[in-house]
């Protein structure tokens, strides 16, 4: 009986901690696009600025292809 109560209290505390940290971190990521580009360049082989590209292939490290060149 005591063990069951301890487990229930522990689960309630862990759930409360997760909810508190989720509310605190809401809206704190300021540069989402920059972070996304950084992940893209680290996870795939990408083309550097000035290299030829196609808009449909998304292979530029910067994430943008303008007039056939990575920019």
Curated annotation (Swiss-Prot):
The modification Cysteine amide is found at residue 70. Residues 23-45 form a propeptide. It comes from Conus catus. Expressed by the venom duct. This is Omega-conotoxin CVIA. Disulfide bonds join 46-61, 53-65, 60-70. Belongs to the conotoxin O1 superfamily. The presence of a 'disulfide through disulfide knot' structurally defines this protein as a knottin. The cysteine framework is VI/VII (C-C-CC-C-C). GO terms for molecular function: calcium channel inhibitor activity; toxin activity; transmembrane transporter binding. Omega-conotoxins act at presynaptic membranes, they bind and block voltage-gated calcium channels. This toxin blocks N-type calcium channels (Cav2.2/CACNA1B). Shows a weak voltage-dependent reversibility. It is noteworthy that ancillary subunits beta modulate recovery from this toxin block. Cav2.2/CACNA1B expressed with the ancillary subunit CACNB2a (isoform 2a) shows a low recovery from this toxin block, whereas Cav2.2/CACNA1B expressed with CACNB3 does not exhibit recovery at all. Residues 1-22 form the signal peptide. Keywords: Amidation, Calcium channel impairing toxin, Disulfide bond, Ion channel impairing toxin, Knottin, Neurotoxin, Presynaptic neurotoxin, Secreted, Signal, Toxin, Voltage-gated calcium channel impairing toxin. InterPro entries: Conotoxin, Conotoxin_omega-typ_CS. GO terms for cellular component: extracellular region; host cell presynaptic membrane. It is found in: Secreted. Its main location: secreted.
């Amino acid at each position: 009986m005591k063990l069951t109560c301890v487990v229930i209290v522990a689960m309630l505390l862990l759930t409360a901690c997760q909810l508190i940290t989720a509310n605190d971190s809401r809206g704190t990521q300021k540069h989402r696009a920059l972070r996304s580009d950084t992940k893209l360049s680290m996870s795939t082989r990408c083309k550097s600025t000035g290299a030829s590209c196609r808009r449909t292939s998304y292979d530029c490290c910067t994430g943008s292809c303008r007039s056939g060149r990575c920019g």
